Regions:
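Terminal accessory carbohydrate-recognition/targeting modules of carbohydrate-active enzymes
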Residues: 1-163
Length: 163
């Protein structure tokens, strides 16, 4: 079930689709995600193991897909920091490292994108790939005011701080 997200009092709005893609209402490009696991690339909208929930009473989505030895979890929520951002959190609950590909490069990240991304998937120009260790989390953020890339501030709220 797709839902609208944004910050109260802010003008930016977006839609989180039922597979965790983010479609900004300002006409900018959709942000989709893919997972390079041990055996293959996983595209959420094509995965029968896809599950999504919204935290009761809060605008935080959680989308899960099954990968070898666990789940890959994506959470989406908005914060007012830096003029408003949509934060996308990827938690690898499996026991193996993976890589996450996102279809936009104008995002803040908690770690540098991979210089030599994995092969086996055709990604749109401007996509980035981020390594995610086993049992670890990476976050990216899409600025609401204007496209930015760079380091995500360490004090950016987590999904637990939003709910």
């Amino acid at each position: 079930m797709s839902r609208v997200i944004g910050n109260r009092g802010g003008t930016w709005r977006g839609v989180v689709t039922d597979h965790g893609s983010i479609i900004p209402s300002d006409g900018s490009a959709e942000l989709s995600w893919h997972v390079a696991a041990d055996d293959r690339w996983y595209t959420p909208q094509n995965e029968p193991s896809l599950r999504q929930k919204w935290y009761a009473g809060f605008p935080v989505s959680e989308t899960r897909i099954r990968i070898p030895n666990g789940d890959m979890v994506q959470r989406v929520y908005c914060v007012a920091d830096l003029g408003g951002m949509t934060v996308i959190e990827f938690e690898n609950e499996s026991t193996l490292p993976v890589a996450i590909a996102v279809t936009r490069s104008d995002v803040f990240t908690t770690r540098a994108p991979a210089e030599n991304p994995p092969q086996g998937i055709d990604l749109p120009a401007g996509s980035i790939v981020l390594p995610v260790g086993h049992k670890s989390t990476v976050r990216i953020a899409l600025a609401h005011s204007s496209p930015h890339a760079g380091r995500l501030p360490e004090d950016t709220p987590t999904h637990q701080q939003v709910v």
